[in-house]
Design a protein with these regions (language model features):
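Long, histidine/aromatic-enriched segments associated with O2/redox biology
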Residues: 1-198
């Protein structure tokens, strides 16, 4: 891989969609669908430049080994289960991550993704997300304050520089469940945040 996928480096995207799926057919259908999807994303980027659209197609360990013929991604491995089910491992074959400033554009791109991948995949989960007021998550706190800022700094930590994987990245996806009732009872004093947006 020589070109960084458009969804790796953007900052401050307001909305996102994550689609996770398993492979139904052979990997060649997945390979062709990925190419079609990348072309579709470029079309949407040209049509909606204000959306700051980006997308990522990522593969699980087993599918990557089939796609690559066993080359590269030496550190890619299945996620182990931790904490007696507190950190379950869903381990799907494919992740499509779509992000931009406009949810309706994301939705259109997701529809294009599902059309491109078609019968090659079995969708297991589709999640729509957004950043709340002032880029806060639903806990009421600003999210991502410790993330590297600026494209060059982000590139330094997120993109592989050399070798067969140059331009590629590893993706680690987590989903957190917040107890909003409990969080809303907590004081924000001393948290580094002056107030909540509500």
């Amino acid at each position: 891989m020589s070109q960084v996928q458009s969804g790796i480096l953007p900052e401050h995207c307001r909305a996102a969609i994550w689609i996770e799926a398993n492979l139904k057919g052979d990997v060649n259908a997945l390979r062709e669908a990925s190419k079609i999807f990348v072309d579709n994303v470029a079309t949407f980027q040209a049509k909606f430049p204000d959306a700051k659209l980006g997308a990522v197609v990522a593969f699980g360990n087993n599918v990557w080994r089939q796609l690559s013929g066993g080359e590269g991604a030496d550190e890619l491995k299945d996620f182990p289960v931790y904490g007696k089910g507190l950190a379950p491992s869903t381990q799907y074959d494919l992740l499509i991550h779509i992000l931009s400033a406009r949810h309706e554009v994301n939705f259109s791109v997701a529809q294009a993704a599902l059309a491109a991948f078609g019968d090659a995949i079995d969708v297991k989960e589709e999640i729509h997300g957004f950043r709340w007021v002032e880029e806060r998550d639903l806990s009421g706190f600003v999210d991502g304050t410790e993330n590297p800022a600026g494209e060059e700094t982000r590139r330094e930590v997120a993109v592989i520089k050399d070798g067969v994987d140059a331009g590629g990245s590893y993706v680690f996806v987590q989903r957190w469940e917040h107890n909003l009732k409990q969080l809303n009872r907590m004081s924000v004093a001393g948290s580094g945040d002056d107030d909540r947006p509500y």
